[in-house]
């Protein structure tokens, strides 16, 4: 697989946030992925297992500003408990190594799929681990709800991982099935310093 990224910061009001790095970076990578997927329906699984391990190499020889290795792992498990109810688990890890990881390439915690309640990039570092468990229940006709709990952590390296910096996450959501097994979701997630609302199509994972 090929991966290309170009990022440029413009009109930076607080240059110190760049930590002395350049205001633009380019990265071109080649990668290899191993995947196993037994989900019954990817956009809204009721049962099954999804595993994906990906390694991507961004060498200077391909035009990358910095030479970087990126490892990502996704593990999802789904189990039907009773009629209309699914229990879903999600685990995600991203780890970037190199002499210097550009601000545009670090792992970013938050967003509309994991750690809902934190905006994307609210916490960022070379490495990130996130886990969540979600209970999904259809209530009546096309209407349903979801509740979840989760946690996440960012860290510069595995040997500097600190449990006390783990961030909590929990929330509740409404589901409307606008066609068979395809949901519109409205989620309200809470984090350490507040919350946010997410509107999207299909489940978070």
Identify the function of each model-found stretch.
Residues 1-4, 49-57, 73, 89-95, ...:
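Transmembrane beta-barrel strands of outer-membrane/channel proteins
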Residues 1-26, 30:
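Transmembrane beta-barrel domains of Gram-negative outer membranes and organellar outer membranes
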Residues 8-18, 49-57, 107-116, 151-154, ...:
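Flexible, solvent-exposed coil segments and beta strand-coil junctions
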Residues 136-167:
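C-terminal hydrophobic structural anchor segments
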């Amino acid at each position: 697989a090929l991966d290309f990224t170009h990022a440029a910061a413009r009109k930076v009001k607080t240059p110190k946030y760049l930590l002395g790095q350049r205001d633009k970076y380019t990265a071109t990578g080649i990668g290899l992925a191993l995947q196993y997927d037994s989900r019954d329906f990817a956009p809204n699984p009721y049962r099954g297992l999804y595993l994906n391990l990906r390694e991507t190499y961004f060498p200077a020889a391909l035009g990358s500003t910095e030479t970087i290795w990126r490892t990502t792992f996704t593990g999802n498990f789904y189990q039907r408990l009773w009629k209309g109810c699914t229990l879903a688990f999600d685990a995600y890890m991203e780890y970037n190594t190199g002499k210097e990881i550009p601000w545009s390439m670090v792992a970013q915690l938050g967003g509309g799929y994991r750690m809902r309640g934190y905006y994307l990039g609210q916490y960022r570092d070379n490495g990130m681990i996130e886990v969540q468990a979600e209970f999904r229940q259809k209530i009546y006709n096309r209407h349903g709800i979801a509740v979840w709990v989760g946690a996440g952590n960012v860290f510069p390296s595995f040997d500097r991982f600190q449990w006390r910096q783990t961030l909590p996450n929990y929330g509740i959501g409404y589901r409307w099935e606008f066609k068979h097994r395809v949901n519109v979701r409205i989620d309200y997630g809470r984090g350490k310093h507040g919350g946010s609302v997410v509107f999207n199509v299909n489940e978070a994972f």
